[in-house]
Amino acid sequence: MTKSEKIIELTNHYGAHNYLPLPIVISEAEGVWVKDPEGNKYMDMLSAYSAVNQGHRHPKIIQALKDQADKVTLVSRAFHSDNLGEWYEKICKLAGKDKALPMNTGAEAVETALKAARRWAYDVKGIEPNKAEIIAFNGNFHGRTMAPVSLSSEAEYQRGYGPLLDGFRKVDFGDVDALKAAINENTAAVLVEPIQGEAGINIPPEGYLKAIRELCDEHNVLFIADEIQAGLGRSGKLFATDWDNVKPDVYILGKALGGGVFPISVVLADKEVLDVFTPGSHGSTFGGNPLACAASIAALDVIVDEDLPGRSLELGDYFKEQLKQIDHPSIKEVRGRGLFIGVELNESARPYCEALKEEGLLCKETHDTVIRFAPPLIITKEELDLALEKIRHVFQ
């Protein structure tokens, strides 16, 4: 039995089976490349679901983490830490928002945004108590906690978890008329992924996000953009909402915000929204901790200094066009923005992901029939060409 096989056996024996990973163990990683315990090398084309946009173990981020670990790692929010203010300023200026509320995971940030929207609805908009509604979209994925599960359109995500939470409506993604019909006097917010990731890299129709912005303005409704996966350069823009030149009332960020070395998420909004929180109304012991802030400050610097959105845009266009040239009866469509690309098949994508793994390329199926390609944004054109060679070989 190999070391990898032993690790997988232990994992399957002791771990809850809430994931179905490819049969590979990763023990080392740097940049775009990872290794298993046997020394086999693989190209990472998933980036931990876009948490590693800056590449594995980016030296600037790792050094920031090490330096901070030598000083202080956690004080809780009972006291001030010396880098939280610096992080607040950096992320707020980057997003063009007044205030930030840090959490740890993407789902926590979504829950935070939903709580903010409801309290804003009652305290600012004046909706009758316990009547506020939030509109989401079919195909959405906002996390695995109870509120995101309750607003999901996937039956399997909800099975066995009832009773689900009330106060959510769902409409079809891309349908302006359906959204217009769903908005009423009790609508507090519209929650949308500018690009639906888990649904199969679904790109909204041109002008759709702008239409959401206009409807929200017309009806005094908060526009909440879940940019956890598509944001911070992944789509070829700093924020995926930038594709329609719109600014949401609320940004939700996570994943690459911590550079792939420490979990951190954030809700960003102006004072009118985040000032609804008062001491004791929301919190997190680890939210905005010194280690997370140190990693995030460095992670944001890397995104800006190395122009990762620009790299993603240029290389993503090239990669997408090359993928479109692969002639295979199983390929239904190639779509995406930046280095956030889905190859939709007429059959299950899992066998193709397994075959690509054997070729030394790691990716993951999403929504059963879509292969998601989302490499670290530091990838080179030469590395993309190598990936294309492997992809062509599998489809041949």
Swiss-Prot record:
Cross-referenced Gene3D superfamilies: Aspartate Aminotransferase, domain 1, Type I PLP-dependent aspartate aminotransferase-like (Major domain)
GO biological process: L-proline biosynthetic process
Superkingdom of origin: Bacteria
Catalytically driven reaction(s): a 2-oxocarboxylate + L-ornithine = L-glutamate 5-semialdehyde + an L-alpha-amino acid
Main location group: cytoplasm
GO MF annotations in UniProt: identical protein binding; ornithine aminotransferase activity; pyridoxal phosphate binding
Metabolic or biological pathway, per its Swiss-Prot or TrEMBL entry: Amino-acid biosynthesis; L-proline biosynthesis; L-glutamate 5-semialdehyde from L-ornithine: step 1/1
One of the record's GO cellular component terms: cytoplasm
Pfam family, one: Aminotran_3
Record keyword Amino-acid biosynthesis present: yes
Residue ranges the record marks as coiled coil: none
InterPro entries documented for this protein: Aminotrans_3 (IPR005814), Aminotrans_3_PPA_site (IPR049704), Class-III_PLP-dep_AT (IPR050103), Orn_aminotrans (IPR010164), Ornith_aminotrans_bact (IPR034757), PyrdxlP-dep_Trfase (IPR015424), PyrdxlP-dep_Trfase_major (IPR015421), PyrdxlP-dep_Trfase_small (IPR015422)
Family per record: Belongs to the class-III pyridoxal-phosphate-dependent aminotransferase family. OAT subfamily.
Name assigned to this protein: Ornithine aminotransferase 2
Species annotation: Staphylococcus aureus (strain Mu50 / ATCC 700699)
Lineage: Bacteria, Bacillati, Bacillota, Bacilli, Bacillales
